[in-house]
Amino acid sequence: MKNLLFLLNALQRSVLCFMLLTSAFAISFTSCSDDDEDIPQGGEIDFGVPPSVVDGVRPTEASGVKISYNEDGTIRNAEVDGCTFTFNYAATRAAGSRKLNSITADRSDGGSTESWKADNFVLLSNGFIGGYRLAYSMNDSRNDWWEKEENNYQFSYQDDGKIEKINMAVTASDAEEGPFSDSGSYSYTYDQNGGLRKIVGTSHGFTYFEQEYEYSSDFANKYNTMLLTLAPEDLISSDAVFRILAVTGFLGNASKKLPQKANLSYKDPEYPEDNETETWNLVYDISSNGVINWYSVNGQQYTCKFIDADHVEIQ
């Protein structure tokens, strides 16, 4: 049987939008933990403004994610490809933060129903999220199909707050298969100036994914914006909650520079003839005050919008 991780990666790349909202079966199989470390156990966390925010500037739209904030600066909800993910908080709260219980979304389309729930959050002493659990389920009465999965994330960071490693573990089942599981990790490498150089995905001792960056111009990332081009492609293409938390700054500080190119490679240990490569050519439009107005990937443009600490849009 072909390597499960590679098959799921290929499927995600070919049907990105469809996967995200209608077939999350492949979510996170692409990036699970090889390590024997225990996934941290969490629960409610104090959830306010992350330490990655510079001068109060926060995104309301970036990398296809649209974010709405409460008056106290906490996130109300986020929209990803037309699906709204709601941030659920405890009734009691302190000034500047709330107790985050879960992030949830539901979607129905004819005879198909889907549900996402992220919970069991871990908040580290550096102010960033150290882990969470994502549960997904889907039932399609039209095709007599169902599937369920649970993904557990663990994040570690460098001393300067930049993400260093993502460990993951997943268990799943569906209408055809019994329960099964997988694991793997992503590792990040930076240069001496704080620019992201490489992301490597491994599973069971095999490197199946590499994402390497090139810099030809000196574009400073003034407001520490975590564009999703600075995260693993096969993870951002399959997990909407990861996308939201990354863009809003809860998964660490971003690369200090913005790359102009990314070279991606996907490897299959059993069928090397199916290995693939891809190149992203990255272009940015940056305002005179350092805010990213938009960026493009191979010509496809993504709008970015930001607000200041007073919730006023920055022009």
Locate the predicted segments by residue.
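Enrichment for repetitive, rod-forming helical segments
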Residues: 19-20, 250
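N-terminal hydrophobic targeting signals that begin at the initiator methionine
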Residues: 1-2, 33
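Buried hydrophobic residues that stabilize the cores of well-folded domains
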Residues: 35-315
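C-terminal motif of bacterial Sec signal peptides marking the signal peptidase cleavage site
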Residues: 28-31
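Bacterial N-terminal signal peptides that target proteins for export
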Residues: 3-18
